[in-house]
């Protein structure tokens, strides 16, 4: 059995009310307090609008949920409530529903974010260090509260570049971590799925988020979005194996006594690891440093137990400048 290296027993020692989301009694607010301004996006499970609170004129984001199991909605609400006020976690303001259709909506703080496909190519080396560090604060916090996000990707990281403000959003796939529990492997978005999901290891943990973060980081420093571009879940593992090598994959499978299905094994083939230096080119070399490569290498490990935790990641030398700037800013406040 595999268990998390950190924050293993958070939900074991907390009262049942903390993690037992099925028992949540939702306190509904008033839908009339909000009006929709414009549509800003849609996901598999929701449509998202910019809105405003008609009483205060304050901008907000309204996430109108598509018909989905009540249990899943309660899970998202409970997690958002548990994490509210944590560093760089999107704030849930209210939960409302339509009187007639009973369609629930979640009301969040507004973040004036730019599409990552537009923003990322403009980021400097320092910007990337800064924003990844801000994202790590959110991840370490949610992990410390016994929660895995399970859908870390650029689309779920809102950045207001003018205010240098980052928020981790969309907690719809997030789940409470219970040691030894077997989870659904059909989570995360394909390009950010950890090897554990692709080889059907079900007793995964917070370290799944660290793989997804590694994929996101690789995309940013190498300017290759997405970094692992699989056409389906099988091909996703092939794309990973072509970079990390197949001996290392075998080692991982053996350690956890897993077998690949023969069809997948044939697709994966045999590959030697590809050095990270092979991804450096004239376009991205200003973003790649020895410490960036070292940091990436410690995230993109097949074995989830070998990946840096969010806390360990924050202590990596890659963030030394960011931490120095942060402590001097705090001193001068």
Swiss-Prot record:
It is an enzyme of class 2 (transferase). ATP binds at residues 40-48, 63. The keyword Metal-binding does not apply. Its EC number is 2.7.11.1. GO terms for molecular function: ATP binding; protein serine kinase activity; protein serine/threonine kinase activity. GO terms for cellular component: cytoplasm; nucleolus; nucleus. It comes from the Eukaryota. SMART domains: S_TKc. It catalyses: L-seryl-[protein] + ATP = O-phospho-L-seryl-[protein] + ADP + H(+); L-threonyl-[protein] + ATP = O-phospho-L-threonyl-[protein] + ADP + H(+). Keywords: ATP-binding, Cytoplasm, Kinase, Nucleotide-binding, Nucleus, Serine/threonine-protein kinase, Transferase. The active site is at 151 (proton acceptor). GO terms for biological process: chromatin organization; circadian rhythm; DNA repair; regulation of cell cycle; regulation of circadian rhythm; response to gamma radiation; response to UV-C. Disruption phenotype: No visible phenotype under normal growth conditions, but the triple mutant cka1, cka2 and cka3 show altered circadian rhythms and delayed flowering under long day conditions. It is found in: Nucleus; Nucleus, Nucleolus; Cytoplasm. CDD domains: STKc_CK2_alpha. The keyword Nucleus applies. Pfam families: Pkinase. Residues 34-319 form the Protein kinase domain. Casein kinases are operationally defined by their preferential utilization of acidic proteins such as caseins as substrates. The alpha chain contains the catalytic site. The tetrameric holoenzyme CK2 is composed of two alpha and two beta subunits. Acts as a circadian clock component that maintains the correct period length through phosphorylation of CCA1. Heterotetramer of two catalytic alpha subunits and two regulatory beta subunits. Belongs to the protein kinase superfamily. Ser/Thr protein kinase family. CK2 subfamily. This is Casein kinase II subunit alpha-3. It comes from Arabidopsis thaliana.
């Amino acid at each position: 059995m595999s268990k998390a290296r950190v924050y293993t027993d958070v939900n074991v020692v907390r009262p049942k009310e903390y993690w037992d989301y099925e028992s949540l009694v939702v306190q509904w607010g008033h839908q009339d307090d909000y009006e929709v301004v414009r549509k800003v996006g849609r996901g598999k499970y929701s449509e998202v609008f910019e809105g405003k609170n008609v009483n205060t004129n304050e901008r907000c984001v309204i996430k109108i949920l598509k018909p989905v199991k009540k249990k899943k909605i309660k899970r998202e609400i409970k997690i958002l409530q548990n994490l509210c006020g944590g560093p760089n976690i999107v704030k849930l303001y209210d939960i409302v529903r339509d009187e007639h259709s009973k369609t629930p909506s979640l009301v969040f703080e507004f973040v004036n974010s730019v599409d990552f496909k537009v923003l990322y190519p403009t980021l400097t080396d320092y910007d990337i260090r800064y924003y990844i560090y801000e994202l790590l604060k959110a991840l370490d916090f949610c992990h410390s509260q016994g929660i895995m996000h399970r859908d870390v990707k650029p689309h779920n990281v809102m950045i207001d570049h003018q205010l240098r403000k980052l928020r981790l959003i969309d907690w719809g796939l997030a789940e409470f971590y219970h040691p030894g529990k077997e989870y659904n492997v059909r989570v995360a978005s394909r390009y950010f799925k950890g090897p554990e999901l692709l080889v059907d290891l079900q007793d995964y943990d917070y370290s799944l988020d660290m793989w997804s973060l590694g994929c996101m980081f690789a995309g940013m420093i190498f300017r290759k979005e997405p970094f692992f571009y699989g056409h389906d879940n099988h091909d996703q593992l092939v794309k990973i194996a072509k970079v990390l090598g197949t001996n290392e994959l075998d080692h991982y499978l053996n350690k956890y006594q897993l077998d690949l299905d023969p069809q997948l094994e044939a697709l994966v083939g045999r590959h030697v690891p590809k050095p990270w230096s092979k991804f450096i080119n004239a376009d991205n070399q200003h973003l790649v440093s020895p410490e960036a490569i070292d940091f990436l290498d410690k995230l993109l490990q097949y074995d989830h137990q070998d990946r840096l935790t969010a806390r360990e990641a924050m202590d990596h030398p890659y963030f030394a400048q960011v931490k120095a700037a942060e402590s001097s800013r705090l001193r001068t406040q």
